[in-house]
Design a protein with these regions (language model features):
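N-terminal interaction/assembly modules
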Residues: 1-163
Length: 163
């Protein structure tokens, strides 16, 4: 079962943050990044709510941080995006490089590079409709970087899809 669209957007947002962490920490294993991310997100949510772990009921304490934050479908989709993208980094980069006109892939900003990888994985491997993925990628690039990043990502992914 697929989570609703707004939840899929949140899953992509979380996945991008973890993929950026992997890009910045290339020796970190995906499972460590996932565990750390979920724990950090849970801690931030608890702090914002003014709660301590002692305030949790017994059932909540039995859950892992990721289980407390998101439904099973959202969490599974997020983790599928992260694991899949990280497992295919070299192949995704090789597929994207020809479409980064006038840019060396290594010289792209970390956000732009990771957004492109995530989108390419979702288009090619998960077969999500390209217009949906491109729109999401543009929004993520604009949110985590700037308007120009959104335009750049749009151009690269448009060429990538037309291939």
């Amino acid at each position: 079962m697929k989570p609703p669209t707004n939840r899929r957007h949140k899953a992509r947002e979380w996945a991008l943050q973890m993929i950026v962490q992997a890009d910045l920490n290339p020796f970190a294993k995906p499972e460590m990044i996932l565990a750390h991310f979920w724990e950090q997100q849970w801690s931030c949510r608890q702090e914002a709510a003014g709660k301590e772990d002692d305030d949790l009921d017994e059932m909540e304490r039995a859950l892992q941080p990721g289980e407390r934050l998101a439904s099973t479908g959202v969490r599974e989709f997020t983790e599928q995006l992260v694991r899949g993208t990280l497992a295919q980094l070299d192949a995704l980069d090789a597929q994207l490089v020809p479409f980064c006109e006038h840019w060396s892939f290594d010289r792209l900003g970390v956000i732009e590079r990771c957004v492109l990888r995530l989108a390419a994985y979702e288009i090619r491997t998960l077969k999500t409709p390209a217009p949906v993925v491109i729109n999401e990628a543009i929004e993520l690039a604009k949110y985590f970087s700037n308007e120009e990043a959104g335009a750049f990502v749009n151009g690269v992914l448009d060429r990538f899809v037309r291939g």
